[in-house]
Amino acid sequence: MRYITAGESHGPQLTTIIEGVPAGLSLVADDINEELARRQKGYGRGRRMQIETDQVQILSGVRHGETLGSPIALVVENRDFAHWTKIMGAEPLTEQEEKEMKRKVTKPRPGHADLNGAIKYGHRDMRNVLERSSARETTVRVAAGAVAKKVLAELGIKVAGHVIEIGGVQAKEITYSSIEELKSITEASPVRCLDDEAGNQMMKAIDDAKANGDSIGGIVEVIVEGMPIGVGSYVHYDRKLDAKLAAAIMSINAFKGVEIGIGFEAAHRPGSEVHDEILWNEEHGYTRRTNNAGGLEGGMTTGMPIVVRGVMKPIPTLYKPLQSVDIDTKEPFTASIERSDSCAVPAASVVAEAVVAWELATALIEQFGLDRMELIRENIEKHNEYARGF
């Protein structure tokens, strides 16, 4: 599977075209809208989320609630475009209209793509950069991820994300009996955190940052249960599943780090306390005593839950902006302010779920069949039976 997205933050709509989704997948707009609504929630979101009520239109590739195997086109309207029709319109402006246009951006914001993108593409108005580099684009990435989640769900694979740190407030490790329980707890939390006490402290940290005109980041974790053993490859570097997952997490706006399993903690432990001992029983076949590897070894799944974490930096759009330089006058200035969140970590956990789900669904389809869900399901069942008795 693959997809491409198009659209600007304040343009008329966001679009994604998805290719390679097998035929026979049950899919309706509400499957996607549910994920879009989850992305819009979360303590610390800005005023933009009060304007947009994201709803998807499925334009192709689905008929009567079932995928056809042909490309799927999804569109999400930007309601805020009504206030930006002249500024973000596709048609040329008159000389007078250009003079009257007030939202030209010549002051790059530290931490954003503004300056680098303007230099790369030769844009004197950096709105041409910030409109596309905006995290608003993750709307349709979540839409694509919702399709991937449906693929996984029909194959018995469950995905959940949650927040484990915001602004230096760390959640305690909370035990849960199932992915369903994890989901029910996090969906009820304004910051998508399992630890209620830490969640309250996180909200206070967000409030404090907002009051100071600042922003804060954090860490999200995605857990996936039900993946078969041996998905991915050790044969070539670019087929390693852990490498693909790491790239997917790092592709999310403002993410600056990723780890799988115990991650960087492995540097502090001896090998005897890192590697997961292998067990076998007649009912389940091969399993592990621990899961320090986070469900991945040698670029392939081990059959244990996949555990991936990502670090999100504080959003660089601040209400007490940092110093910058005007690209026209070269004079020092405080950076332009765009409407923004004070913390988007809870929403980012939903985006992280989406990109992880996409990579796993893609890997399964490549390995177990391309054309129809029935074939993929049968092949996975045969593979699991083979692996248990290996």
From Swiss-Prot:
Pfam families: Chorismate_synt
Paired cysteines (S-S): none
Cofactor remark: Reduced FMN (FMNH(2)).
GO molecular function: chorismate synthase activity; FMN binding
Keyword terms, alphabetized: Amino-acid biosynthesis, Aromatic amino acid biosynthesis, FAD, Flavoprotein, FMN, Lyase, NADP
Single GO biological process annotation from the record: aromatic amino acid family biosynthetic process
Presence of the UniProt keyword Nucleus in the record: no
Transmembrane feature ranges: none
Entry EC no(s): 4.2.3.5
UniProt-annotated binding residues for FMN: 132-134, 253-254, 298, 313-317, 339
Chain residue ranges for the region called Disordered: 95-117
Residues noted as binding NADP(+) in the record, renumbered to the chain: 39, 45
Catalytic activity: 5-O-(1-carboxyvinyl)-3-phosphoshikimate = chorismate + phosphate
CDD domains with a match to the protein in the record: Chorismate_synthase
Enzymatic class: lyase
Cofactor(s) the record lists: FMNH2
Pathway entry: Metabolic intermediate biosynthesis; chorismate biosynthesis; chorismate from D-erythrose 4-phosphate and phosphoenolpyruvate: step 7/7
Entry-linked PANTHER family: CHORISMATE SYNTHASE
Family note: Belongs to the chorismate synthase family.
Function statement: This reaction introduces a second double bond into the aromatic ring system.
Protein name: Chorismate synthase 1
Organism: Bacillus cereus (strain ATCC 14579 / DSM 31 / CCUG 7414 / JCM 2152 / NBRC 15305 / NCIMB 9373 / NCTC 2599 / NRRL B-3711)
Gene (name only): aroC1
